[in-house]
Each structure stands twice: as structure tokens, then as C-alpha cells.
Curated annotation (Swiss-Prot):
UniProt record similarity statement: Belongs to the KAE1 / TsaD family.
Protein name according to UniProt: tRNA N6-adenosine threonylcarbamoyltransferase
A Pfam family hit: TsaD
Species this protein is from: Coccidioides immitis (strain RS) (Valley fever fungus)
Enzyme kind, highest EC tier: transferase
Residue ranges that the Swiss-Prot or TrEMBL entry lists as coiled coil: none
Record bears the keyword Nucleotidyltransferase: no
Transcription regulation in keyword set: yes
Amino acid sequence: MIAIGLEGSANKLGVGIILHPDNGGEPRVLANIRHTYVSPPGEGFLPKDTAKHHRKWVVSLVKAALKEAEIGVSDVDCICYTKGPGMGPPLQSVALAARTLSLLWGKQLVGVNHCVGHIEMGRYITGAQNPIVLYVSGGNTQVIAYSSQRYRIFGETLDIAVGNCLDRFARTLHISNDPAPGYNIEQLAKKGKRLVELPYTVKGMDCSFSGILAAIDALAAAYGLSGDQQAKENIGLTEDALKLKVDSVDKYNNEGGIPTREDLCFSLQETVFSMLVEITERAMAHVGSREVLIVGGVGCNERLQEMMGIMARDRGGNVFATDERFCIDNGIMIAQAGILAYKTGFTTKLEDSTCTQRFRTDEVFVQWRDD
């Protein structure tokens, strides 16, 4: 059985093809192709521009995936697409492409939850059996555990996602979005030597990142490290952040010098990743798990994997993570989750093949897993 998966919930358009042998053998990745919309430094990606990018590239990527997989249309059993969550216009573009292929090829559709796609691909690649899942990306931050055919959310962000926090600080510093702003933050952080105190906000199993972002934006503006316009206008600084800016300048002047861009990136990573380690460890203790699976684009971060590994080993456990081929948004994860659902008899009718920006992880009935 062969499934093709289309992913395009944000700025990455992915097409993947996976084979599940009829004899029950090991699944095999036949193709995994991706193209990214990269916005200029200091800017995020607008939904309309991202959707335009997806519409431009989707046909080329589908053709390239079929060629790489060395299969024809007749070999495909189902077409899987990201139903949500994500950005509206990009999701609509991919859903439209999936519906078009379904009509042209005469194949069944399968709508897939983006997060469930990450989880199932992570389980397949790493072999993790029943881990606590830390799902960290530009749009989502969740701590998840499986129970009774649902992926249950134990904790999550109360405001913005951790990846969004890192990406927006990259915009503040006016650094490149190529290959990804979070990746460039990580590279700068490796050169940082000074830990700057930042707000640390964990509330039970939940966390918050907007206050940390406001604080570090204020520091960057105060030190003249932010983008030119923001440095001049102090865009978006709250009253508390402005006070923090003045206090911090005085503090670091007294200590003999101010932090560098690298120090700020290092400090931001250390703070937000410590928060993620804390809530993940709490979930492990609650369910008695010794496994952690990190999925989502931020899961590629080597420092996050290192910090999580230290915690897990102290508990006699292990951390599982994938490389950028499968951690960053991709089409093969949608194909994997979709084919698992398809094998249980699940399909999405053409008239129901919509998309939604809000599609909770725990809304999905995970029929393919046994208790």
C-alpha cells in the first residue's frame, strides 16, 4: 500500500511518498521532498505570500516525488493532506491541491492532523514505543502522552509557541531567515558565553513565552543590537519592558560591559529550553514513562536535545529525536499518519475535505493504536 502526503501548514511545502508492504514488512520512505518560502531578514512570512508560494511549487514537487519514488499514479492508494492546524491560506492551497489530485487520479482523500503526523513519523523513525512527546514548533508547544486511543495534551503554551518566540527574536536581531531563523539563533547561541537573566514562566504543566520575548526585545533595543528601525523607534516595547531596558543597561554598565547578540541568543535558548525540560519531566513522572520523543521544527535544536537528554538519563530514561529531514515539517509525516488511518478504513469525503486553523491534537481518534 502506498500513500502520498502533502504538507503546507506554514512556510514549508512538502510532498512525501511512503510504502507499507502488504505482507506487514517494515514501512519504507520512497520520497521526501520539501521547498521553503524564505522571507527577507527582519520579516515574517505573510499567509498570502506563503499560499502563493505553495500554489506555485506544489505541482512540481508532486511530479518530482513520483519520479524519485519510481512509481506511477496507478500505484498510489490514497492522497493524504494536512487538515490543520496551521495558517489558513497555505492550508487552503494544499487542500485544494489534494482535492484536485483526488479527482484527477480517482484516489481517496485522508485529512491528517499536523501534530499527529509529527508524532507518528517520530515513532516510526526512532522506534520509541510509548513516549512522552514534546511537540515544539513555530506554531505549537505541547507536552503529550498517549492514552485510550487519544494523544492527550498534558501541558502547552498559554500564548505563543516556543518556535515563534525564537523566530520573532531573530527578526528583532534582523538576522537571515535562510535556512530558518531558529537555526540561525541556534548557531549564534553556540558562541554565547554570558547568561543574561530573563523571565521564567512555568505554571504547572503550562508555560508562557510572550513575556520572555518582550524582555529580550527590550534588552536588544537597549544595547543597539536590534534591527535599525526597531532600534530607532522601540517598536512594541511595553512600559514594563522599557523599565527593564533602563534597569538592565545600568546593571550591565556597572558589571563592565553589555552582552553580545550571541549572549542574548544563548540566554534565550537556555531559559526557554529549561522551561520545556521542566514540564516534560513533570509529565514523565506523572505517567511513569522513561522515554521522551521530541518532534517539530524546534526539535532539531541540538542544545534542546542535549538538555532533555541530561534530564532523561538522570531518570534512567532515553530521548528520541529525528534529524531535519523528518523533524521539520514534511510531506512524509502526513503520508505516514494518513496511511495508518486509511488502513483502519478511515477516509475523508470530497465534500468534507476542508481545512481548519484550529485542530487540537486530542481531537483525533487514534484507531490504529491498541491500548
